[in-house]
């Protein structure tokens, strides 16, 4: 008898397999209503030689110097190759962020989909690997390392990236993970490593270094304070900072934005309209052209492929509000693109990663209810094609988004960002009309 069940979420059908429940390991962090399989290192099969004391051989054939944790026990790093290890990789953050009220647990179904080599379009042109760190048989850290040939071709560089870094507060563990990532890239001929970046800067990136006391917003990173020390004590140095800004309904912010946008818009015939969801694929094709042109010269940017952009757009459509996805045209020519998302971390945070419990869509019901109660947003994308800048396009985007979000949807505030630290034009404009820089994220690099 088939015990699987299915649920529908905004047009998507999700199959929920019913599986036996294994026993939980010592010190495991459990999600509500579940137990986890034992966390252990792969055993050495009969006839195989165990790794030497001074080095660790992972299953990709790479030799990594073995370090010790602060407790004097050796750290072992292994590449993820099985479904069980992938589950451990996805669920490990629950150990790091237990008790952190500002962390937003990802939906497990989405976290697994992001790493699916068969379905995520990044793997059509790039490659990546996942690593887990173990001490005394327990998972104590994780890291993603990726190689994007498109980025190197666009910028004339020879780099790879690391991301999804999580570690207990232990330099031996962190260094072991970073060593494994660097060695993986060296084997592919790369000579520089940059991060934290999950595949590319089109996805979550940056290490939080300022602003730990406010909630994690949608599609942004969150991490403990000690991560910066772990990365810097390895040998990573600052490449650039990213700023996140806070806009709220205090004072006369809307009035100031309105005056600025109106004055600048008089310089040209600018039209701002919502993207038509009824003609979604055609509209997304227009937006992709603008997106890639607007950010082409930005630090760290790599053009998204058609498949990547459509994949991401369809994912975000589940949560997006049509009047907050905007396309600008100047004399009929696409000139800019802006996306403000409801901060659905507000809706998902109470679910602790689960849409289902014991096969029942309890989390899904809560999610649909919570989505109607969201009070903040995040302006995640705002780009203007270079020849149309200084015509009020960006200012009109921000004004329209604030007006609809605050006046129509009842939002009390919104995050804008990220922006590059050296983008003086946009940073000064945001400050001038009352925006407050409230978070800073750092990207690091090192020769390898």
Language model features: what each stretch is:
Residues 2-17, 49-69, 174-271, 442-448:
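Acyl-donor-binding surface of acyltransferase catalytic domains
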Residues 152-235, 240, 352-433:
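Acyl-donor binding region in acyl/amide transferases
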Residues 1-21, 31-33, 37-42, 52-102:
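Generic start-of-chain signal for non-secretory N-termini
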Residues 76-88, 272-286:
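A short beta-loop-alpha structural element at the N-terminal edge
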Residues 86, 149-152, 201-203, 252, ...:
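Flexible loop/turn segments at secondary-structure boundaries
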Residues 93-136, 143-153, 274, 279-382:
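A conserved beta-strand-loop-helix scaffold within acyl/acetyltransferase catalytic domains
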